[in-house]
Amino acid sequence: MTNSYIKDTMDTFSEFEVEQDDLDYWFNVINEEVFEGTCPSPHLMLVKRQRGSWGYVKQAEFGGEHWVALFMSPKFPTLAAFIQILAHEMIHVWQFLSVGDTGNHNKNFYSWRDRFKEFGLDLRRNY
């Protein structure tokens, strides 16, 4: 098992309100620990209220340029839930920007399952 700040934080059980600085901070921590620095930063990362979703990644073409945006809800039941879902969404960012994948829950997506387990993260389709 890997020692990590992520793993140590997964026992936090109080409600977590996300600020933009939190999103930036945890993206960097997860990128360094889980992705070993291989997840490119999306073009846009925002804390944004969204109905029926804790987080999502959107890709679009603007002026012939490929853009990827990551959106996360401003409230989570726990910090652990936020970390779990952000890490999940980061796989989609990685799929779009690193391997040119569709970003679906496919073989590339689930190739991260063992790595997630090392950090106490559960990789699944829905949360």
Where are these regions (language model features)?
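Walker B catalytic acidic pair
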Residues: 89
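Active-site-proximal or metal-binding-adjacent scaffold patches in catalytic folds
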Residues: 1-84, 93-127
